[in-house]
UniProtKB/Swiss-Prot annotation:
Top-level taxon in the UniProt lineage: Eukaryota
Subcellular location: Plastid, Chloroplast
Organism this protein belongs to: Arabidopsis thaliana
Name of the protein described by the UniProt record: Peptide chain release factor APG3, chloroplastic
Gene3D superfamilies the UniProt entry points to: 3.30.160.20, 3.30.70.1660, 6.10.140.1950
Organs and tissues of expression: Expressed in roots, leaves and stems.
Transit peptide: 1-50
Entry's Gene Ontology molecular function annotations: translation release factor activity; translation release factor activity, codon specific
Induction: By light.
Length: 422
């Protein structure tokens, strides 16, 4: 037996057995694992003992592991250590690959143990007890390899560079008049509850209250750990079906609100030409006090190229409202840029991933049946707890769906590439 092979507990119990040469028939397990002949010829000793159904996965992981090793060598270089900026950059790059390398090495270890156990199963002969023990180990290793393969596929997927960012979340009343404004207020509270559950910092940026309750439009700032990665799936049209408080006949009305998720952008990413801005001040109708309607603290900002108008009143000073207005403008312009890029990618991939288009109806909140239906997931959730901020199950399901579709795209791309090269 190859002495360099990682030895399983069952294998160690049989090291005294004679390893006579024989050939194992090549066959695949449900996980896509296939066996090769044993012992390998001298020319094949350096090849993989177990192979995957997707060779691209192995090639990619081997490339990642090679990069990780190269980074490890560089980090030990005294010249790099003395340059803190370079050292931190390389250390960050290496840490981002740590999980991939750890899982891949465990995957290779399990592959070797699996082949070893298969060999021992042949050597066990008629020993039923030993055959049962080896069979149990083979099943265990096969299942672990399947799970590790799934992890590796997910780790292969490109990460969204915006996932770690804070966001500005805008909810805007759609069709439905006063009821749409009230529904907008309900959604604002839902996201506030979800932020509290997630230990995020939630604050109002700019809100236009409606006459009969709720908001015509409301913009919130949410800061915390990987906010965008969770809330990016909320972009789209949210439809509600319920009997409005003002409805005397008990008829169910349908109203909508549109949610936009805008990752925070800095001044370097979005350059705003002062000549494109019209800025005026106005009197604020704040929460009360001597300054109401006496001091012009509100800011009315108009961006001429895009037609975006922002009215900020939430802060107590004109300077802070101006800063908020420009912050929101940058986020809106950046969100437009990101959305256009994502749309271009979706068109190129011919993908139907429903994770952002504003015109898309993503959910229906049905009060009569106390049910929330996510149309992308084709899943239902309990209305009361959902509106109280219990969004995590839906968020995780959206993330899983996106991963699944990205993996399908990756497999199709690899298949097309293989067909072309073949």
């Amino acid at each position: 037996m190859n002495s360099s092979m990682t030895t399983s507990p069952t294998a160690r119990a049989f090291l005294h057995l004679h390893s006579s040469p024989f050939t194992l028939r090549s066959r695949k397990s449900p996980s896509g694992v296939c066996l090769v002949s044993w012992p390998p010829s001298r020319s094949r000793r350096t090849r993989r003992l177990v192979c995957m159904a997707e060779p691209y996965l192995i090639r990619k992981m081997e490339s990642v592991e090679k990069t990780w090793k190269e980074l490890s060598v560089k980090l030990a270089d005294p010249d790099v250590v003395s340059n803190q900026s370079e050292y931190q950059k390389l250390a960050q790059s290496m840490s981002e690959l740590d999980e991939v390398v750890t899982v891949f090495r465990r995957f290779k270890d399990c592959e070797k143990q699996l082949l070893e156990s298969k060999v021992l199963a042949k050597e066990a002969g008629d020993d039923e007890d030993m055959a049962e023990m080896i069979g149990s180990e083979i099943n265990s290793l096969t299942k672990e390899i399947e799970e590790l393969e799934k992890q590796l596929k997910v780790l292969l997927l490109p990460s969204d560079p915006l996932d770690a960012r804070n966001i500005l979340l805008e909810v805007r009343a759609g069709t439905g008049g006063d009821e749409a404004a009230i529904w907008t207020g309900d959604l604002v509270r839902m996201y506030q509850r979800y932020s509290e559950r997630s230990s995020w910092k939630f604050s109002m940026v700019s809100c236009s209250e409606a006459e009969h309750g709720g908001y015509k439009t409301c913009v919130m700032e949410i800061k915390g750990n990987r906010v965008y990665s969770k809330l990016k799936y909320e972009s789209g049209v949210h439809r509600v079906q319920r009997v409005p408080q003002t409805e005397t006949q008990g008829r169910v009305h349908t109203s909508t609100a549109t949610v936009a998720i805008m990752p925070e952008a800095d001044e370097v990413e979005v350059v705003i030409d002062p000549k494109d801005i019209e800025l005026t001040s106005a009197r604020s109708g704040g929460a009360g006090g001597q300054n109401v309607n006496k001091v012009e603290t509100a800011i009315d900002l108009f961006h001429k190229p895009s037609g975006i108008r922002i009215f900020c009143t939430e802060e107590r000073t004109q300077i802070r409202n101006k800063a908020r207005a420009f912050q929101l403008l940058r986020a809106k312009l950046y969100e437009i840029k990101v959305r256009e890029q994502q749309e271009k990618i979706r068109n190129e991939r011919k993908s139907q991933v429903g994770t952002g288009a504003r015109s898309e109806k993503i959910r229906t909140y049905n009060y009569k049946d106390s049910r929330v239906t996510d149309h992308r997931l084709k899943m239902n959730f309990a209305l009361t707890t959902f509106l109280d901020g219990a969004l995590e199950d839906a968020v995780q399901a959206c993330a899983a769906l996106e991963q699944k579709e990205l993996m399908e795209e990756l497999s199709e791309s690899v298949a097309a590439s293989s067909a072309t090269s073949g």
